Structure formats: C-alpha cells, structure tokens
C-alpha cells in the first residue's frame, strides 16, 4: 500500500476542514470580536473538547486500534462485531452519564476552568448556559471518533478526515443566518456545535454499513477485548489528562489576564493547529495502523523504516512552515481576522502568541509521530511519563514567562515543553535502537536547514515589497499573502532539488 496516497488524501480533507475553520473564525471575529461573549464561548467550547481529547480521540484510538487489528487479523466477523458492540455499549453508557453530570455541574466546572469569570457575574452565567447546551457534544463526537477509528482500520482514511467539515459548515451557516434570532447572539454558536456534531456522527454510519461493521450496542462488558482496552486506557488517560490539565491551568492563567487574552490565544492556537492538523494529525493517523500492523507481525525493520519516513516528511514541511508562520504572523492575522470588531490591538496581541507558538511547531508534529510509534507497540507508559514531566515543567515556567510576556508567555512555555517532550521520547527510541542520527540523517537535516535559510532571504525581500497589509480588499490581501507564501515555497523546493532531495523519493510502499 502506497502510504503517500492516503497521507495526501487525509491532508487534503484536513486542509479543506481547516480552511472552513478559518472562515468560521473569521466570521466569529467579525461578528463578535474579542470580547466577554467570545471568551465565554471559547471557554465553554473547550470543556467538551477537552473531555473528548482525554476519553476518546487519541486515548481511545491508541488502545483500541491495536486490539481491533488483532481481531481483524483473525478474520472472524462475528467476534469483531461482538467486540465492537461491547465497546459501543460501554462508551454510550459512560458518555451519557458524563453528559448528564456535566450539565448539572456546569457552573462549578466553569469556575474551576476560569476563576476569573466570577467577576463580572454575567460572564459566569453566560458561560454556564453555553456549556449546558454544548455538553452533549462530548457524546456525539466521541461516538464519531469510534466510527473514525473503525474506518481507519479498514484503510478508509479520507472519510473520517472529511467529517469535521460538517461542524465548521454548521457554525458558519447558523452564525450567518440565525444569530439575530438569539439573545445574546453568541448562543447560536452553542446550538450549531451540537448540530454539527450530530451530522459528523450520522455521516459515517453508511460507510460502516458498507464494510458490514455497523452494529448496535450491547452491555456485555465482560468482553475480553473491551477489558484489554480499559486496562490500557488507564495510563493513556493519565498521559492525555496531563496535556489537558496543562491547558486548563494555562486557561486559568489567561482568564486572570486582560480581557481578550483567551480570545487572542484561541485565534493563534487555531492558526498553529492548521499545520499541526494537516501534517501531524494526518501523518500519525496514517502511520499508526501500519506501525501497529508491522509491530504485531514482528517486522521490526519495516517499522523503523516507516517511522524514519514519517519523521523526514515532517521535517521537510514543518521547518519552512514554522519560519513562514513566524515572519508572516502579523500579515496572516490581518488578512484572516481583522474585520468588524477585531482591532489593530487584537492583531498585535494575537501575532505575539503566534510567533512564539511557531517556535514549537516542529516539536508539536514530532511528538505526535513519536507517540504513535510507542502506542503502536502498546507501550503507553513512556509517553504518559513524558507528558507528566512536561506538565510539571510547563506550570513551573508559566508564572515566570507570563510575568515578562503576559498572555504570550503561555505560548512560549508550551513551545519549550513540547521540545522537551520530543527529546524525552526520541531518547527512549534511540535507546531501543528504533531511531538513530546516522551520517545520512545528519546530512538530510543540514540540507533542509540550508534550503530554509535561502527561503528566509527571499521571504524578507517579499515582505519589504509588501510592507502594508491593512489596506485593500480581502481578495487583494489574500492574493498578496499567497504570493509571499508561493514564492517562498518555490524557492524552498528549488533549493531542495539542487541539494538532491527529491519529493518523488518519498513515495513509501508499506508491505
């Protein structure tokens, strides 16, 4: 199987989703600005998203897919369906209970998440109401993640990658046409999240039916596969919780800063998640099932080659990407967000965060890939320990960095600790002789750096030619922005070609 083909497919779907996500954020910034209302929505929306990341997305798939691959290799359809039915029954019961409890304790959760919202009280009341509306999203999106994991195991990668598009379409549609029907109008965003999550789930069901894996839940929780997954999920949840606890504490810090800080961080976070999602998430998704399959079959050499291929692809894209984001931070934010109530000051504050986030872009992507390498071996404790250590380091650094850099200090702290996480994981893989920095790898890295340095020179020339970004129509600004990125990208590819790095050589065929 040619892994570059599904990678391109998943990346393309993710790109479409992220572009729609930017359209969504542009509309939110234009209609609602960076205010008490957007702070309330972003905080409320982060809570079900946080729980999703702890209990479903990464954590669940890391434990679930290797076990499912074992069932699949036995080629006993009845056993596979019984296993999936038990998983579905357990998840439905647990998530429904979590949704009910979350709705009941919404105000307390908001106060824990953002104690700065206690004053003014209107901010707390609004956040609580928004959270109660959106809490069922955790149920919908977690079941959608289960469907995605099953489809990925059958090599249906592009279908799950396409599903997040429906959430963005829902938010865009209801924001534009129905915001005037709600008071305050920000409530429309909460309902659009629920509708989008429901469509995400329903969209994948016909494809499960196509592969004959659409099952009904049962409540026989003594299934061996289910018990294995629950046993593995303990360390996985602890590791995922460490990352999310870090985000919670970061939000607590930001809620105590100037009004708008949460929104500035959110918009910068959305921009850095664009390349992380397109490359990091897409690549780790495609790699994970193949890594797990090769490890289960004892093909260690193929496993190592596959991981090396993923890391090289990541470096080729992420190094120039981080440079472009750093130097084009302000123009990108002006072009995408400076409309309506989004001011020059908002642009400046958001750009500061984005520049510091871009310093950690390479490590954000590398950590996802290296974590997948451990999860494919069913070795969950090492990423967990690394996450716990970086959580502690992150929070030790936060007060110091926030004192000097205000809200941007949170981004700098995350970038530094992400690099530490990468070094810890790579050291463990090096000790196991899975990764190594041999002469060929060292030369490859040097060549990528040289190509990037030449690109930086050309990028400075382009920026000098187009020094004013806040005038002109949206189309005019978009064309100028893409021209700068296009010229930089062509320069980078040209230099890689001169240095002997051919992209066609990265068509990897997995055995």
UniProtKB/Swiss-Prot annotation:
Membrane protein topology class: Multi-pass membrane protein
Q: Which gene encodes it?
A: murJ
Protein name, as recorded: Probable lipid II flippase MurJ
Kindly give the PANTHER family that the UniProt entry links to this protein.
Answer: LIPID II FLIPPASE MURJ
Identify the pathway: Cell wall biogenesis; peptidoglycan biosynthesis
Q: Where in the cell is it found?
A: Cell inner membrane
Q: Which Pfam families match?
A: MurJ
Which GO MF term does the entry hold, naming one? lipid-linked peptidoglycan transporter activity
* Keyword match Cell inner membrane: yes
Keyword ATP-binding among UniProt keywords = no
Q: What does this protein do?
A: Involved in peptidoglycan biosynthesis. Transports lipid-linked peptidoglycan precursors from the inner to the outer leaflet of the cytoplasmic membrane.
